[in-house]
């Protein structure tokens, strides 16, 4: 059985110039088609020196299911590589933030976001097909103020899947124990969503 991320691994950690024009143009068309002028969901993606991760990340976001209009905004956070060239080539909506750090970058994106629901994520990640929809399903509940998500590692060639599974299991156990008394500490500021109203 093919994993959901298999096609994105073909371009992950590869320079965009080594990827076929057909793939690049396909992602560009999808990305531009899903950008709404009146989004309900704003996905804010921060990037610092992510030229070899952006294509896979944005491609996976373009393939996400979302039942409402959305926008994807990328914030270039003081990159010194070809991050901005990749964003331009993909036709991404992006902004520059000169103050270095995820807090500054996220705030820049949020300042430009128009959606009622904001999802803050990172550019070095590939997102499963229902990622945005899963956040949204929870955020629309009146009693929910914010959401967060865990992450999993994709093993490199020659790496053991089990080593990563042990690490992730210990991490998840720690978070479950922590969530008993202080669930707000489980967010960790990496990937999270919230409603603006």
Describe these PLM feature segments.
Residues 1-60:
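N-proximal low-complexity "stem/linker" segments adjacent to membrane-targeting elements
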Residues 52-55, 81-88, 130:
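Acidic helix N-cap motif at the loop->helix transition within catalytic regions
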Residues 59-69:
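Short, acidic, metal-binding catalytic loop of nucleotide-sugar glycosyltransferases
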Residues 60, 76-84:
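A conserved acidic beta->alpha catalytic loop
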Residues 97-113:
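Glycine-rich, basic loop-to-helix element that forms the pyrophosphate-binding segment
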Residues 118:
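Short aromatic/hydrophobic "clamp" motif used to bind/position activated sugar donors
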Residues 130-161:
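Conserved donor NDP-sugar-binding/catalytic core segment of glycosyltransferases
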Residues 149-155, 164-185, 189:
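Short, flexible, basic/aromatic active-site loop/helix in glycosyltransferases
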